[in-house]
């Protein structure tokens, strides 16, 4: 009887072990990467995509042949100076940067090799990434201060991006409130998402002011990590 019981227990343990192995083998979640849902499940994991946004701010957005003119966020702020009144191009010269910064060469609007495409692609990529983080606000787990930090940073990034797009692709705010500005996206998008029409200058500034107010509220009292 003891031998029978012993063999029965060994067999039972073998079945349990085999069952566990089979469940492990059938696990579909990768062990060397995380899904977008997994990255946004808690505040600590969400620092990864947030860090990615900040890392991309000093990376080139252009093909290798044009990294001299689009080498990250600094190149866009330098370009903004050139398009303003602090620095004046008095003559076209050889043509370098003349039409590029005026944005009036239509053949270059859709080219990935020129600045207008870079600026548009850059800021809307940050907006898209921020929208994914913000969409997880109600489900993100973690200490309240940590969640507030991640969400607050995402609001700040989106506000800044819309501000720069408005500065670049629209006229000044005062006196032009009802004129076209840039499209507004506040929800995650994917390839094939129907594009939104251009919002007015007033609508874009209302959106970015709302975002920055939320960022200030959430980031108040949190430990700075960036």
Spans of model-derived segments:
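A structural signal for short, hydrophobic/glycine-enriched beta-strand patches
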Residues: 31, 43-44, 68-111, 120, ...
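Conserved, well-structured interaction surfaces
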Residues: 94-169, 199, 214-225
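Surface-exposed patches in mature extracellular/periplasmic domains of secreted proteins
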Residues: 60-69, 146-147, 222-226
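Membrane-proximal, proline-rich intrinsically disordered regions
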Residues: 21-77
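Inward-facing hydrophobic residues that define packing positions of alpha-helical scaffold repeats
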Residues: 50, 127-130, 205, 212
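Short coil/linker segments at helix-helix boundaries
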Residues: 168-207
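Sec-dependent bacterial lipoprotein signal peptides
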Residues: 1-19
């Amino acid at each position: 009887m003891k031998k029978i019981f012993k063999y029965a227990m060994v067999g039972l343990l073998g079945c349990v072990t085999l069952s566990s192995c089979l469940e492990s083998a059938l696990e579909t979640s990768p062990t060397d990467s995380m899904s977008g849902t997994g990255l946004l499940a808690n505040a600590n994991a969400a620092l990864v995509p947030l860090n990615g946004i900040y890392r991309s701010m000093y990376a080139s957005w252009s093909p290798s042949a044009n990294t001299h003119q689009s080498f990250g966020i600094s190149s866009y702020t330098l370009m903004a100076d050139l398009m303003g009144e602090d620095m004046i191009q008095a003559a076209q010269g050889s043509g370098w940067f003349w039409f590029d910064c005026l944005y009036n060469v239509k053949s270059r609007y859709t080219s990935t090799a020129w600045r207008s495409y870079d600026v548009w692609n850059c800021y809307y990529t940050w907006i898209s990434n921020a929208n994914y983080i913000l969409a997880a606000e109600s489900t993100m787990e973690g200490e309240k201060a940590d969640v507030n930090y991640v969400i607050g940073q995402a609001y700040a990034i989106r506000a800044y991006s819309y501000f720069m797009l408005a500065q670049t692709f629209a006229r000044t705010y005062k006196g032009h409130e009802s004129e076209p500005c840039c499209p507004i996206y506040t929800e995650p998008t994917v390839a094939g998402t129907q594009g939104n029409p251009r919002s007015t200058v007033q609508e874009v500034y209302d959106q970015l002011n709302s975002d920055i107010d939320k960022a200030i509220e959430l980031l108040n009292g949190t430990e700075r990590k960036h």
